[in-house]
């Protein structure tokens, strides 16, 4: 578990080696970049340790962030991230948290676009390691072999919001709790979409 790269992004100045723009120094955005670089370096040292101690080729490495780094609801962060990305920083970027798995001896790579959450990590890793998960209280599913991808999103957005990779939809419920006043985005490019009320209502009911 790494905590340095977590708000409030406090890092000893002796470890903050990135040269930032003057306008970013001391800002939440600037501090975030410094801790990202530091965490990346620390992770590199872990990899070096595994290799040095003959553990790397016998270790499955899984990396996942439990939530986004920069909150778009904070105006100063929203502006900084939009400027940094060169496009609007919206929920499609904020909620896009990667789950990376390295398997020793597997000389191929794959990108899976199935939507999932932390509840799906254990079943995914267990299947890769051929572990039996047929127990009464195992939640989630194997993301690499899932029939669908669906997340009921409740953090930062209202109950009834959802993300589904089946229809490439990211939907946020309206502030009045209705689907009609909500907002629909494409998972593919973040573009705004017209709301199909019947389809969105089905997914929204499921999310609740």
Annotate each PLM feature.
Residues 1-208:
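Solvent-exposed soluble domains appended to multi-pass membrane proteins
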């Amino acid at each position: 578990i790494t905590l340095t790269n977590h708000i409030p992004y406090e890092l000893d100045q002796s470890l903050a080696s990135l040269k930032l723009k003057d306008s970013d120094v001391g800002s939440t955005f600037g501090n975030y970049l410094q801790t990202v670089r530091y965490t990346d370096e620390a992770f590199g040292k872990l990899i070096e340790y595994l290799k040095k101690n003959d553990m790397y080729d016998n270790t499955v490495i899984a990396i996942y962030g439990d939530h986004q780094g920069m909150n778009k609801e904070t105006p100063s962060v929203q502006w900084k991230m939009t400027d940094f990305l060169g496009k609007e920083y919206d929920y499609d970027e904020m909620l896009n948290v990667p789950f990376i798995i390295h398997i020793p001896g597997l000389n191929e790579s794959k990108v899976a676009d199935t939507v999932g959450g932390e509840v799906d990590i254990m079943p995914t890793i267990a299947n890769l390691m051929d572990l039996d998960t047929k127990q009464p209280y195992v939640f989630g599913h194997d993301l690499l072999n899932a029939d669908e991808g669906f997340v009921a999103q409740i953090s930062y957005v209202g109950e009834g919001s959802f993300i589904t990779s089946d229809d490439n939809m990211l939907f946020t419920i309206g502030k009045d709790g209705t689907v009609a006043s909500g907002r629909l985005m494409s998972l593919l490019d973040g573009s705004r979409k017209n709301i199909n009320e019947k389809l969105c209502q089905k997914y929204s009911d499921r999310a609740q």
